[in-house]
Structure formats: structure tokens, C-alpha cells
Amino acid sequence: MAQITMYTDGSALGNPGPGGYGVVLMSGPHRKEISAGYRLTTNNRMELLAVIVGLEALKADGNDVTIYSDSKYVVDSVSKGWLFDWERKNFKDRKNDDLWRRFLAIYRRHRVRFIWIKGHAENPENELCDRMANGCAHGANLMEDIGYRP
């Protein structure tokens, strides 16, 4: 069982618009950075997708994962239990249910703790995630966010 620290950020230009996410994973001496961009999406989808991709990148189950995010949407949905209420109601009338279902599948394989951090507050890893997310949103060859629904 590893101790993992994860920083995430997501952005969308126009909301909806082109978007991207950035993830920094750290465990002991190991560090991994992940990012990608999408043609049409929202900032909330990119914030949530960053967390999902980070968790999916872990090679084994049962890790202790601390996730630092500046997204109240993601942090509060989990920490305040809203997500589990939505799940009990089969995500009726909930946006991003495709991503929340994907999140739950990987979330339950680890011990995850969320910590909200203020964005643009000079945290080096959060700032790096922000630069990666924005860089990807401005990039060429953006992917399609097939789950996005206006």
C-alpha cells in the first residue's frame, strides 16, 4: 500500500469551450505528470476528469491517496456526501453522471482523502497543473469529450 499525493486542475475556455486537465502524482521519489485537452467541454468536467485520470494511473489498488484540488465542485461533491446521494437516486437529472460513475468505480479501490486548496495561491504543483490544463486547452489536436452534454 503506497502513500500517493495528487494535485489536479482543470479548465475550459468559454465554459463550454476547449478544455484541458493537468495531474501531478507523487509517491516517495516517483513523480508523474499527466495532461490532455478536449475540443468542447466544461471546467467542471475537466476538474473531475483530472481526478479520475490520476486515480486510474495508479498501478495497484489499496493506496492511501491525498488529492489536492481547487475545485469546490469535486471536493464538496465527495466530502459533503452529495455524490453518494446522487448515486442512490441513479444520478437522476445530474450533469456529468458519466464521469461520476467512472470516478466511483476507481475511487472505491483506494482510500481517498480530498483537500481543497485555493487556486492561484502559489502552490507549485497546483500552478503546474493549471499551466498544463490551460496549455492543453489551447493546444492543437484536441480530443472529443464524448460524454459532454450541453
Give a label for each model feature.
Residues 1-45, 49, 53-63, 131, ...:
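RNase H-like nuclease fold core
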